[in-house]
């Protein structure tokens, strides 16, 4: 999510436009982290990682979570023989209570996604944009809509169905 790290939602607008083109042909697997890159919480911080997760769960595609991201795991990928060790730690038998707040947010976003199954084919349309703030709507094939407000200055996200707030973080 370089658009969050670089504080440039115009980059995200371009990416979502390209993503819409993919959705015209197939439903892509979407992710914000994987086993080959520095962890999202390390790249953009834990609070900003929540904004990235909100995007992941409100755009078209099949969202995937890299284990530990839902707990805010950190890890820097390095360019050496053991460079993947920090991003691929053993999964603990029990999660730390320190990551519970992030896990609860992920659970809420997953629940929102499950309540709106049409999102997997949703196209996005940017309604308002500035470098550090963006509002877009995700529109399903049947005309269903959710509106997403992202703000990097306040580090906040709101997801609405019409006037009803479905999710809020700040």
Give the predicted meaning of each segment.
Residues 1-82, 89, 151-152, 157:
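Conserved alpha/beta catalytic core and glycan-binding cleft of carbohydrate-active enzymes
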